[in-house]
Amino acid sequence: MSMVFHRFDDRDQAARECHRVLRRGGTVCLRAATIDRAGSYAYVPFFARSSAILNDVLQSQTVIETIFTSAGFQSVCHELVRSEVAGSWGAYANKLALRVDSILARLSDQEFDAGLAALREHAATAPLDEPVVELVDFFVFRSV
């Protein structure tokens, strides 16, 4: 699963369903945004209320591990992976302008427009070839 775990209404049930459909020894790989890194996501400095929304919506690394171990999984590993979200700040602004990010979709039109304007202002002065990079939590769980 990649960057969707926070969107499930019943995360415990989602983990139990993974356990149900996997054979013993089966693996779940989960790439997820976590509250532990919420302040470091690239759009947070530009969209003021995004930090509060992230803190409300995301789970911590510990909570995610607990959900899966409670559902019958063993934690195999956790690491932070470097994820390039855009090749440049300008490309990142264009990507966010589509307004498909589930966190930014919760902002009012005024909040979103102000944040996008601030991001575009930053993009205008950033090096053209500077990629936008975030650290994302990557988990591996094994069914026991």
Residue ranges and their predicted role:
Residues M1-R11:
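A short SAM/SAH-binding and catalytic strip from SAM-dependent methyltransferases
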Residues V4, A33-I35, V81:
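Histidine- and/or cysteine-centered catalytic micro-motif in compact active-site loops
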Residues D12, Q61-T62, A86, T125:
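Structural motif corresponding to alpha-helix initiation and N-cap regions
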Residues D12-T27:
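A short glycine-rich, Lys/Arg-flanked "PGG" loop and its adjoining helix->strand segment in the class I
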Residues Q13-R16, Y43-F46, A91-A93:
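Short, glycine/charged-enriched secondary-structure capping and boundary segments
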Residues T27-L58:
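Conserved class I S-adenosyl-L-methionine
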Residues D56-G72:
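Short alpha-helix
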Residues S75-V144:
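Conserved Class I S-adenosyl-L-methionine
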